Amino acid sequence: MNWIEAALLGLVQGLTEFLPISSSAHLRIVGSFLPNAADPGAAFTAITQLGTETAVIVYFWRDIVRIVQAWFGSLTGKVERNNPDARMGWLVILGSLPIIVLGLLFQDQIESVLRSMWIVATMLIVFGMILAVADAVGRQERDLTQLSYKHGILYGFAQAMALIPGVSRSGGTITAGLLMGYTREAAARYSFLLAIPAVFGSGLYQLYKTVSNEGLAGPYGLPETALATVIAFVVGYVIIGWFLKFVSTRSYRLFVWYRILLGLALYVLLGFNVISA
């Protein structure tokens, strides 16, 4: 049964990681309804995210290679620092700093109290409303060539908010991008690139802890988690292409209503003790 549950959670991770609806919240919610009725845990979540971030690397492979080459070239002087690809490399590094620092400072809280379903429900609703405002009032004039270092660090703090399940990594960064005047597609694209260092760092750290301790602190072992990670990669790759096409022509209204309704449903389920916090 654990294999089936892990496969289902891998599917959920792949479907939700790149949408502004919080994959960690969905893993937490779906896990409560499975036979184990348990939180998959922060380690399981972080490791399966390695699958979806690998999908980002494969999907944006040419862009990433170009950015990395230009960034290294800027270090040796072969490429000017203001080269767009070199700048993007620096912007990704800069934007990754907040989540790394805050993730280390609040690691214990992230793995325990912040995974409360009450917090998940609240964050789904609150940040759904903020996304609605950003989508409505954002000028949506800027593209990524206009991304400044100041905006890069603001993106980074928005990403760090996703350490709280229910906020959504992509939701937080996309919301910040819209509020700063970037187009929906530009905000989503930078969100995907920005997540790579943070997610790989967190996932590899949790994988190291898991291997060192010979097991996961949760209902699923390493083999089941590996299966979930592979499924998350395959499904996530498909979702990236679909999502970028979707946001190029449509608003985020669908995701806003989904977040709010899901959060309200969680309040009801928690209030009637159908699921535990």
Swiss-Prot record:
<feature type="transmembrane region" description="Helical">
    <location>
        <begin position="157"/>
        <end position="179"/>
    </location>
</feature>
<dbReference type="GO" id="GO:0009252">
    <property type="term" value="P:peptidoglycan biosynthetic process"/>
</dbReference>
<keyword id="KW-0378">Hydrolase</keyword>
<feature type="transmembrane region" description="Helical">
    <location>
        <begin position="88"/>
        <end position="108"/>
    </location>
</feature>
<keyword id="KW-1133">Transmembrane helix</keyword>
<dbReference type="GO" id="GO:0050380">
    <property type="term" value="F:undecaprenyl-diphosphatase activity"/>
</dbReference>
<feature type="transmembrane region" description="Helical">
    <location>
        <begin position="227"/>
        <end position="247"/>
    </location>
</feature>
<keyword id="KW-0046">Antibiotic resistance</keyword>
<dbReference type="Pfam" id="PF02673">
    <property type="entry name" value="BacA"/>
</dbReference>
<keyword id="KW-0573">Peptidoglycan synthesis</keyword>
<dbReference type="InterPro" id="IPR003824">
    <property type="entry name" value="UppP"/>
</dbReference>
<protein>
    <recommendedName>
        <fullName>Undecaprenyl-diphosphatase</fullName>
        <ecNumber>3.6.1.27</ecNumber>
    </recommendedName>
</protein>
<dbReference type="GO" id="GO:0005886">
    <property type="term" value="C:plasma membrane"/>
</dbReference>
<feature type="transmembrane region" description="Helical">
    <location>
        <begin position="117"/>
        <end position="137"/>
    </location>
</feature>
<keyword id="KW-0472">Membrane</keyword>
<feature type="transmembrane region" description="Helical">
    <location>
        <begin position="191"/>
        <end position="211"/>
    </location>
</feature>
<dbReference type="GO" id="GO:0071555">
    <property type="term" value="P:cell wall organization"/>
</dbReference>
<comment type="function">
    <text>Catalyzes the dephosphorylation of undecaprenyl diphosphate (UPP). Confers resistance to bacitracin.</text>
</comment>
<keyword id="KW-1003">Cell membrane</keyword>
<comment type="similarity">
    <text>Belongs to the UppP family.</text>
</comment>
<keyword id="KW-0133">Cell shape</keyword>
<keyword id="KW-0961">Cell wall biogenesis/degradation</keyword>
<feature type="transmembrane region" description="Helical">
    <location>
        <begin position="255"/>
        <end position="275"/>
    </location>
</feature>
<dbReference type="GO" id="GO:0008360">
    <property type="term" value="P:regulation of cell shape"/>
</dbReference>
<keyword id="KW-0812">Transmembrane</keyword>
<dbReference type="GO" id="GO:0046677">
    <property type="term" value="P:response to antibiotic"/>
</dbReference>
